[in-house]
Amino acid sequence: MKATEVVEKLKNRFPNEPEYIQAVSQVLGTIEDEYNKHPECEKANLIDRLCIPDRLIEFRVSWVDDKGNVQTNMGYRVQHNNCIGPYKGGLRFHKSVNLSILKFLAFEQTFKNSLTTLPMGGAKGGSDFSPRGKSNAEVMRFCQAFMTELYRHIGPDEDVPAGD
């Protein structure tokens, strides 16, 4: 299968994820010639296995602001690939965070981690929570609520969050 065919398939499967599609398209364009020399790669469905994350975790994060009001944000963790070791990747808190951006970042993190000498897979997570303008207490309450939801999916042998 040609890279353009794979990208079209992914565009149809994930139509609202332009950042993710762009990252995959760029990588596939660079490996297409080498990939086509090895028919065993297509038989093993290597491209789908490389491009599609292992797991997407989406959750609500409810936290209390300084006025006592409950606020709600979305939390995410994209566990992209753990073929060479536990998932590892940063957490990003910013109002622009969405699943497409995190899938793109987790995809890239997989390649970055594979180039180190450490056995680590790739992941990325975060929330549409923006710490800008929040008090230290609000940021702390948000982070506590975020980790209360995320903790069941992480651990030293499974997924290791890092700074962004």
Segments predicted by a language model, with ranges:
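N-terminal ligand-binding/catalytic initiation module
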Residues: M1-D164
